[in-house]
Amino acid sequence: MMRYPEHADPVITLTAGPVNAYPEVLRGLGRTVLYDYDPAFQLLYEKVVDKAQKAMRLSNKPVILHGEPVLGLEAAAASLISPDDVVLNLASGVYGKGFGYWAKRYSPHLLEIEVPYNEAIDPQAVADMLKAHPEITVVSVCHHDTPSGTINPIDAIGALVSAHGAYLIVDAVSSFGGMKTHPEDCKADIYVTGPNKCLGAPPGLTMMGVSERAWAKMKANPLAPRASMLSIVDWENAWSRDKPFPFTPSVSEINGLDVALDLYLNEGPEAVWARHALTAKAMRAGVTAMGLSVWAASDSIASPTTTAVRTPDGVDEKALRQAARARYGVVFSSGRGETLGKLTRIGHMGPTAQPIYAIAALTALGGAMNAAGRKLAIGKGIEAALAVIDADA
């Protein structure tokens, strides 16, 4: 049965990103495209940076780079890491592992702690590595690795790195805005996120917190990109209406970010985090009651923004997702890299971080499993999810 053919738009997108954008954000994207040196746009840009600073709870101005957050992550490696740095990369998933490849490009001295991709980094292992290698100068970690649906204890890790005197790079692309995390909470020197996950805006921008000592290190690094898309230092003062932009900013994306930040701040960050957490909790309860299992090794490290569901033996994961889309109009994400074919990722970020979407996801997932010959107790899954939701009412 193909009620929703591939060429037709899906009914609901429940992926790990890009995610559905809020309708208000989409309307914001449709605002007039202003000349970037028009005083009205320069004032808007300054206000958007101020809103980002408030949302990120920073004591200094954040940086906005004009490309989706992978640009920001690579820029962080290129700008902060110099050839004499010793980098410790913490890998608990595909994206954490991937940052190590960038780090290796800019310094030959790479150490790594890697754990199975359904587990989290143990702060004690970080402490032991820092003690064994006092020469470590930079540590990198992915907070939420979406291909695993797991989160790392970055506040504890950050405290250890700070005490050691090393610089900390944090990938918070799919965690910021969906749970309590801020650059200064985890003592990050470069903290990379974006609007295209939990803030419910399209991909196209990077938001970055940069510590004062990271600014100093990047400026002193002769190999840090300048006059380049990968440059961070070129954008240091771009927030000020009195300073020129290094190149044309993404005007429409700034319009969208302006609205996304207003929505986040007006709803209240704690309220936003709470609905992400409730949706994820309902999702996990339903998955388990239905007879499936969550990929994360324990509930304590399971993400509140993406639930990774283990694919049962004998089930074709790609066919499963295709069935969910064709039969129910619901789109899920696959795994990536080592987790490809082993799990299905169900995103609940931004506008879809609402408990009712857990019910929709369980229905589509269970129905697709049944179509694959795995008869699941869909009703029990929905009942379990509703019990979680109703208990919070």
Curated annotation (Swiss-Prot):
Top enzyme class of this protein? transferase
What EC numbers are recorded for this enzyme? Answer: 2.6.1.30
Q: Which GO terms describe its molecular function?
A: alanine-glyoxylate transaminase activity; L-serine-pyruvate transaminase activity; pyridoxal phosphate binding; pyridoxamine-pyruvate transaminase activity; transaminase activity
Q: Which residues bind pyridoxal 5'-phosphate?
A: E68, Y95, T146, R345
Entry keyword annotation includes Ligase: no
Q: What does the record give as the reaction this protein catalyses? A: pyridoxamine + pyruvate = pyridoxal + L-alanine
Is Transferase there in the keyword field? Answer: yes
Question: How does changing the pH alter activity?
Answer: Optimum pH is 9.5.
The cross-references to InterPro entries, in alphabetical order and at most eight, read: Aminotrans_V_dom, PyrdxlP-dep_Trfase, PyrdxlP-dep_Trfase_major, PyrdxlP-dep_Trfase_small, SP_NH2Trfase/AEP_transaminase
Question: Sorted alphabetically, which SUPFAM superfamilies does this protein's record hold?
Answer: PLP-dependent transferases (SSF53383)
In the record, N6-(pyridoxal phosphate)lysine modifications are located at: K197
**What are its cofactors?**
pyridoxal 5'-phosphate
Q: Which UniProt keywords apply?
A: Aminotransferase, Chloride, Pyridoxal phosphate, Transferase
Alphabetically, which GO biological process terms does the record hold?
Answer: glycine biosynthetic process, by transamination of glyoxylate
Query: Which Pfam families does the UniProt entry name for this protein?
Result: Aminotran_5
Q: Which PANTHER family match?
A: ALANINE--GLYOXYLATE AMINOTRANSFERASE 1, AMINOTRANSFERASE CLASS V
What family is this?
Belongs to the class-V pyridoxal-phosphate-dependent aminotransferase family.
What is known about what this protein does?
Catalyzes a reversible transamination reaction between pyridoxamine and pyruvate to form pyridoxal and L-alanine.
Which NCBIfam families does this entry report, sorted A to Z? Answer: PyrdoxPyrvTramin (NF046070)
Describe its assembly: Homotetramer.
| Name this polypeptide is given | Pyridoxamine--pyruvate transaminase
